[in-house]
């Protein structure tokens, strides 16, 4: 502990300088597009400096309080945010089931909830199933609000994590060939945020989905406005076509897909079969070209989305990304709260 304290004291001035360099103090993060490219890269540099502390602590935010307010289930997002705040020396108040245990159970409006919580918190992380309600509710907060996943719209901090992981493992984002693949791009909020981030940072982006579940027009229009963006859409691939597409990539990005129930379940299974990532496809490229195609998934994953044998190979990046999740969220929280 004494050695860690000495290390903290030695690193604090340089880390605080990196925090200030982001230039995001007091700001909310609703969309990945709330950050400039320079701010994204500044967050990456800050996260890299904070990586040594992801299992210890650095005393940047002592006395600050984060409230995590999650109207939908979460494991990784909520826990990594809460861990990040603890590692920064701050405190966390969590409400993981507000419809049961908070005043939301008494039909309190989200606006009033946010008004109230913002009196306590230096920063709020909000997850909500309705993005319109979340955006409106967040506007009533006096404290910065971080989107922890809002409806089908965006999940910017998951995209930040996956962009950071690509930056760390691939040596950069610019020029990387990435496919965002899911039969249902309509409801892929992480895919929307990731597509924006990839396009803005210079990756070559392919959106692969069913034509009747393509990305919302708002997302497509947003991508068209990105100067110099290299983005294409492909639809209705069969398994052979999908395998060929995967073979061209540096990264296969799986934003997940919500499985329907009842009669639609069988049709869903057929859809998933067409976007199933097979180890044989990856290994064929590795053997013929000496190139490793990485696969990442936002998790949780469901049976039938991918070949589980990938877990124990160099192609796997989804569990590797979790190791970076605390550092990038430490960086974001520190930049917003200020240190």
Curated annotation (Swiss-Prot):
Pfam families: OTCace, OTCace_N. Its EC number is 2.1.3.16. Keywords: Purine metabolism, Transferase. One of its GO terms (biological process) is purine nucleobase metabolic process. GO terms for cellular component: cytosol. It catalyses: (S)-2-ureidoglycine + carbamoyl phosphate = allantoate + phosphate + H(+). One of its GO terms (molecular function) is amino acid binding. Thermophile. Is much more active at 60 degrees Celsius than at 30 degrees Celsius. It is an enzyme of class 2 (transferase). Pathway: Purine metabolism. The keyword Transferase applies. It comes from the Bacteria. InterPro entries: Asp/Orn_carbamoyltranf_P-bd, Asp/Orn_carbamoylTrfase, Asp/Orn_carbamoylTrfase_sf, Asp_carbamoyltransf_Asp/Orn-bd. The keyword Transferase applies. Catalyzes the phosphorolysis of allantoate to ureidoglycine and carbamoyl phosphate. Is likely involved in a purine degradation pathway. Homodimer. Belongs to the aspartate/ornithine carbamoyltransferase superfamily. This is Ureidoglycine carbamoyltransferase.
